[in-house]
């Protein structure tokens, strides 16, 4: 029975899953929007939201705690200095998941995960990305 077992296995080992979530968190903090499969986006959401909730406090212990999770100093700086202050008054719900159809090769459900109130200049909008993929 799976009582009280949360999370998805994503068909990888636990160390691979932890590294993948950390790398996806760095990409999301850097670009403020990433395209991935729907189950990975659903797993990334609570992971990144706890990091942002910690980053809102912005002291040395929080910095070390976040750095132990994502291991990228520039992403930690942006998380604490920019995103922590941006979402200071928001009690949660920092990300949104937008379903974006299915991948051509294996029909995996694709989704965009992005920050609410994100900086549009950090990465292009969804329509512009879709037009570039069609051209290539």
Curated annotation (Swiss-Prot):
GO terms for cellular component: cytosolic large ribosomal subunit. PROSITE patterns: RIBOSOMAL_L17. GO terms for molecular function: structural constituent of ribosome. It comes from the Bacteria. GO terms for biological process: translation. InterPro entries: Ribosomal_bL17, Ribosomal_bL17_CS, Ribosomal_bL17_sf. Keywords: Ribonucleoprotein, Ribosomal protein. It holds the Pfam family Ribosomal_L17. Belongs to the bacterial ribosomal protein bL17 family. Part of the 50S ribosomal subunit. Contacts protein L32. This is Large ribosomal subunit protein bL17. The lineage of its organism: Bacteria, Pseudomonadati, Pseudomonadota, Alphaproteobacteria, Rickettsiales.
